[in-house]
Curated annotation (Swiss-Prot):
It comes from Hylobates lar (Lar gibbon). A motif (Endocytosis signal) lies at residues 14-15. It is found in: Membrane. It is a single-pass type II membrane protein. Residues 1-49 are cytoplasmic. GO terms for molecular function: D-mannose binding; metal ion binding. This is C-type lectin domain family 4 member M. GO terms for cellular component: membrane. The lineage of its organism: Eukaryota, Metazoa, Chordata, Craniata, Vertebrata. GO terms for biological process: adaptive immune response; endocytosis; innate immune response.
Length: 399
């Protein structure tokens, strides 16, 4: 056994990294081969097998190293390509930003334009402007009509007064009332254009002069009262004109004008109803007759006292619409059979027709009057009913 020599092969060295380079270098540390001694045979040739394997391993490692180096050299190129792509993206974003900035401004201008179009349409439909324009046109036509009447000097003054009245009316706060005044002036124009007597024209001129002074100081309640009085006098003056058809027309127009001024100048509290210069309240709760009188006094009013057929019809309609039995300020508590209002005035004989059939019958000591159905009924005063209060509108109340 000592004669034979053992083949010894130094194994392939470990791969190491050369710290002096930025790349990676792999190499075999030592390749030592032990020559075989003895006979050259197939067995001896086979002793070279490990050497072949080592060469193959070295070749494989060299190929891997080359591939790694290729990839490493490609990295700066890809980084450069990525940087150029970022530059392109940045430029595109810059252009997009500028475009969006212009688009936003343009869209805002478009929006402003549309708003102006809508505002133009809205302003064009404003009732105040159109109504004032119509009032101006009507007064211009009235000027032409009045200018053709016989008394030039007086009619010219009337025209001037109406012009000033136009300016005063143009400053009134409620647009709907401006429209009412415009309609009334239109009717008045037609009536004045056909007045037959110069003396009556003079009276109208004087009344319009007073009306101008009153309208010029409209905010004061005392002046509102003056307007009412002047219109009443004007109504009386026109009522004396000889032409009956024109009298009636002008009277009706002045009545309507008075109503329009009352609605414009006078106000009722919330939940109260305006009618012919007064405010009316129908309660939502029930009390006996005496407590109803007290309830009205507590709000500066009076359990309703009826003064005219028009007022009776209005109140009867209000009561029937609400389907409520309601106390009025009428009783015969002081003397049985003698009906008297709470203000001390007696019941007019012309009002007897408003009692329901068979009433008053004093059945069961019934001494207080109520609205019942389509007329009046007497009832016991301790019965709980709704009640109706009445008071003048604010513009006619003494300060």
């Amino acid at each position: 056994m000592s004669d034979s020599k053992e083949q010894r092969v130094q194994p392939l060295g470990l791969l190491e990294e050369d710290p002096t380079t930025s790349g990676i270098r792999l190499f075999p540390r030592d390749f030592q081969f032990q020559q075989t001694h003895g006979h050259k045979s197939s067995t001896g040739c086979l002793g070279h097998g490990p050497l072949v394997l080592q060469l193959l391993s070295f070749t494989l490692l060299a190929g891997v190293l080359v591939a790694i180096l290729v990839q490493v050299y490609k990295v700066p190129s890809s980084l450069s390509q990525e940087q150029s792509e970022q530059d392109v993206i940045y430029q595109n974003l810059t252009q997009l930003k500028a475009a969006v900035g212009e688009l936003s401004e343009k869209s805002k201008l478009q929006e402003i334009y549309q708003e102006l179009i809508q505002l133009k349409a809205a302003v064009g439909e404003l009732p105040e402007k159109s109504t004032l324009q119509e009032i101006y046109q009507e007064l211009t036509r009235l000027k032409a009509a009045v200018g053709e009447l016989p008394e030039k000097s007086r009619l010219q003054e009337i025209y001037q007064e109406l012009t000033r009245l136009k300016a005063a009316v143009g400053e009134l706060p409620e647009k709907s009332k401006q429209q009412e005044i415009y309609q009334e002036l239109t009717r008045l124009k037609a009536a004045v254009g056909e007045l037959p007597e110069k003396s009556k024209q003079q009276e109208i001129y004087q009344e319009l002069t007073r009306l101008k002074a009153a309208v010029g100081e409209l905010p004061e309640k005392s002046k509102q009262q003056e307007i009412y009085q002047e219109l009443t006098r004007l109504k009386a003056a026109v009522g004396e004109l000889p032409d009956q058809s024109k009298q009636q027309q002008i009277y009706q127009e002045l009545t309507d004008l008075k109503t329009a001024f009352e609605r414009l100048c006078c106000r009722c509290p919330k939940d109260w109803t305006f009618f012919q210069g007064n405010c009316y309240f129908i309660s939502n709760s029930q009390r006996n007759w005496h407590d109803s009188v007290t309830a009205c006094r507590e709000v500066g009013a009076q359990l309703v006292v009826i003064k005219s057929a028009e007022e009776q019809n209005f109140l009867q309609l209000q009561s029937s619409r609400s389907n409520r039995f309601a106390w009025m300020g009428l009783s015969d508590l002081n003397q049985e059979g003698t009906w008297q209002w709470v203000d001390g005035s007696p019941l007019s004989s012309s009002f007897q027709r408003y009692w329901n059939s068979g009433e008053p019958n004093n059945s069961g000591d019934e001494d207080c009057a109520e609205f019942s159905g389509s007329g009046w009924n007497d009832n016991r005063c301790n019965v709980d009913n709704y009640w109706i209060c009445k008071k003048p509108t604010a513009c006619f109340r003494d300060e």
